[in-house]
Amino acid sequence: MENLDALVSQALEAVERAEDINALEQIRVNYLGKKGELTQVMKTLGNLPAEERPKVGALINDAKERVTVVLNARKAAFEEAELSARLAAECIDVTLPGRGQATGGLHPITRTLERIEQFFTHIGYGIAEGPEVEDDYHNFEALNIPGHHPARAMHDTFYFNANMLLRTHTSPVQVRTMESTQPPIRIVCPGRVYRCDSDITHSPMFHQVEGLLIDRDINFADLKGTIEEFLRVFFEKELAVRFRPSFFPFTEPSAEVDIQCVMCSGNGCRVCKQTGWLEVMGCGMVHPNVLRMSGIDPEEFQGFAFGMGAERLAMLRYGVNDLRLFFDNDLRFLAQFR
């Protein structure tokens, strides 16, 4: 057993001299591994008398345990020192700002539509929607647009066949509402519409909001007051507004609505073509023929209607000079509206 004590002393001294974890691992293999010196001593038990084996085996196991405990303690000390050194080298300044997350925002056209809807719902209007693929009757015939009208031409309208087309305005929603609802009616109809047109101020697809009010004793003064108040709230400023006589098949009388140029305050600029005025919408009193075709008696009820392009209003509100920018999906442009 003197040899066993000597092996234990050698092992413990080797552990004390070890400079790193790799050295400790080598010591473990030399003394406790399958071919280690203490393991080899255990294999000599078979050469001893049977009555001595338990006592000697216990001594060998005790020796291995002593070496294992010291070796593990030394290894833990190395690991703790290594961790402390790494933490010191990787010091984190917890006062630094965190990484921000990219956030999205509402599209300027969506913002514009919501702004329009918010005003009209606040004064008692409802929101009405309808199909974008329309039939000829609701898109033209029911709106007092005869077969020879230029709007029915192939170069202005996207046709699927002789009777089905992509709606050119949201007016069919008004017709469907009048057919299914008894007056009084107060609705705005936002939605996508389609026309064969594409340039700096036009797109083959754009967003339109039309409004309709049907009730007894409605006159042009009601229409005028509604539109003037809407424009004041939408642009958040007092603007001069004028109504120019115009013609639409579905309204009589009809008018185009102009506002004082928001770019030059009416002094004349490139945007308003030096006139000081900008056209923003069309409007008028609902034509008696439209009321009759929808099953409403024009002798009892009257109404007004108006329509505006959301892109047009967004361009004026945000100072955008090219309508196509709204649909280019350029994040540099869209990020300005967050």
From Swiss-Prot:
Family per record: Belongs to the class-II aminoacyl-tRNA synthetase family. Phe-tRNA synthetase alpha subunit type 1 subfamily.
GO CC terms: cytoplasm
Protein name, per record: Phenylalanine--tRNA ligase alpha subunit
Cofactors: Mg(2+)
Reaction catalysis annotation: tRNA(Phe) + L-phenylalanine + ATP = L-phenylalanyl-tRNA(Phe) + AMP + diphosphate + H(+)
Enzyme class: ligase
Molecular function (Gene Ontology), one example: phenylalanine-tRNA ligase activity
GO terms (BP aspect): phenylalanyl-tRNA aminoacylation
Subunit comment: Tetramer of two alpha and two beta subunits.
Binding locations of Mg(2+): 252
EC number of the protein: 6.1.1.20
Gene source species: Pseudomonas putida (strain ATCC 47054 / DSM 6125 / CFBP 8728 / NCIMB 11950 / KT2440)
Pfam families: Phe_tRNA-synt_N (PF02912), tRNA-synt_2d (PF01409)
Compartments, as annotated in UniProt: Cytoplasm
PANTHER family: PHENYLALANINE--TRNA LIGASE, MITOCHONDRIAL, PHENYLALANYL-TRNA SYNTHETASE
Cofactor binding remark: Binds 2 magnesium ions per tetramer.
UniProt cross-references to NCBIfam families, sorted A to Z: pheS
InterPro entries per UniProt: aa-tRNA-synth_II, aa-tRNA-synth_II/BPL/LPL, Phe-tRNA-synth_IIc_asu, Phe-tRNA_ligase_II_N, Phe_tRNA_ligase_alpha1_bac, Phenylalanyl-tRNA_Synthase, tRNA-bd_arm
Domain of life according to the entry: Bacteria
UniProt KW keywords: Aminoacyl-tRNA synthetase, ATP-binding, Cytoplasm, Ligase, Magnesium, Metal-binding, Nucleotide-binding, Protein biosynthesis
PROSITE patterns: AA_TRNA_LIGASE_II (PS50862)
Gene3D superfamilies, A to Z: Bira Bifunctional Protein, Domain 2 (3.30.930.10)
